[in-house]
Amino acid sequence: MSKEDNVINNFEEQANELMKERFQKLKELQSNGKDPFDVYKVERTHTSKEVKDNYEDLEGKTVTVAGRLMSKRVHGKAGFSDIHDRYGKIQLYIKINDVGEEKLKEYKTFDIGDIISVTGTVFKTKTGETSIHITDFQLVCKSLRPLPEKWHGLKDPDLRYRQRYVDLIINQDVRDTFIKRTAIIKSMREFLDNRGFLEVETPILSPIAGGAAAKPFITHHNALDIDMYLRIATELYLKRLIVGGFEKVYEIGKNFRNEGIDIRHNPEFTAIELYEAYADYNDMMEITENMIAYICEKVLGTTKVEYEGAEIDFTPPWRRLTMVDAVKEYAGVDFNIIKDDIEARAIAKEKHIEFKKELKDCTKGDVLIGLFEEFCEDKLMQPTFICDYPVENSPLTKKKRGNEAFTERFEGFVFGREVCNAYSELNDSIVQKERFMQQLKERELGDDEAYMMDDDFITSLEVGMPPTGGLGIGIDRLIMFLTDTHSIRDVILFPTMKPQPNNQ
């Protein structure tokens, strides 16, 4: 058994003993007619922040606050305590002359983690700390399970995620991260709403998993007796809305991909997709860099952020680099002079590039993508748009003007990681059907992430979709950068976890 396991087991043993004591205290309260769970509402007049921010107006006046008891230093006939609410902590002062001997005795029985309401007058201590001089109090929830005293000392990589409620209680920086998350998404909506975009909702359950190259989650609809998929992207439904005349739309929501879990990937994640009629991928670059700059200024007050010790500058314009130029710069391979698939495969073999399918089935475009992923991605530290992807790897995208071997697609990279993906959207129904047919062949070759045929989407394109620019951003990854967070699990309140055995 590891040292960390011993620490955890010792804490659990101590917790079990403390829980017995707390259960006994609860029984005594209930027998005395003071059951905290009979409290239905607290008439709170102020939060901790409001008391501190308005001290000059509140000095000497009576307020009622409520929160979780997080420290208690009461000995003899007086003492101090701290309670925490959503906005932070505030100090309490209790004295026997103000509440009486019995009430002080009751207060001393309270445990760390209990939730109380307090009425008292506002004052400042000799050290200048805004505090509340208690005249009355009430226990409104008894905490039966003790909080760990040294949460980070447990060194259990999973425990903070499994018991996020405790993590939020103990760690102010964790609360701050999720408050920033809300502000980031709010600012994103604000930016798009100001530009005339319409927020919409599209299905999460669908008979076809489309819009991205990914493995879906499969479920079964009993009433219809059909298999359905949790969406892997919102793209194809949003494009249907462009066909329907909604010229600027976006959706912020959950996508689901039945793939691996690591510091950058969670099976359930939040993304935004937006589409604008009569626009192209150049317009999507402008929206991307200006929206992220807007969010940075709004939430952080600057477009220069620190991430893992490095400064990232989100100030527009971002660097623009074609994939061919990136591979030439970082891998030393000039695809402008490579003639065909055979020559490209020889380079892939020389560079030891691995693919999901056999090398003999790889195209020149497959090799270009492979070289980019192997040699270029981790070099792209500052915000960079990598443009013009091979046509065989971008089935929903218009061909590049002037070079039909490529498409008008870009991905945005920051700190060596992809954060967004955008196209000049393909709106030719005939070509789109051909692309889907080619994707079906890829599935037959073993690529289970290749696109499925979506006949209804083809039908919508036959009705007619105007030239359109589309953009998708992984919100969780963006939040990681803007909060200097290493793992995606630290920006998702309840990340996907493997269930624990029943006895743990």
From Swiss-Prot:
Location within or outside the cell: Cytoplasm
Q: Which GO terms describe its biological process?
A: lysyl-tRNA aminoacylation
- Entry EC number(s): 6.1.1.6
Got a GO cellular component term for this one? Answer: cytosol
Q: What class of enzyme is it?
A: ligase
Cofactor, how bound (note): Binds 3 Mg(2+) ions per subunit.
* Major subcellular location class: cytoplasm
Q: Which GO terms describe its molecular function?
A: ATP binding; catalytic activity, acting on a protein; lysine-tRNA ligase activity; magnesium ion binding; transferase activity; tRNA binding
Q: Which residues bind Mg(2+) 2?
A: E418
What does the subunit comment say? Homodimer.
From the Swiss-Prot or TrEMBL record, give the protein name: Lysine--tRNA ligase
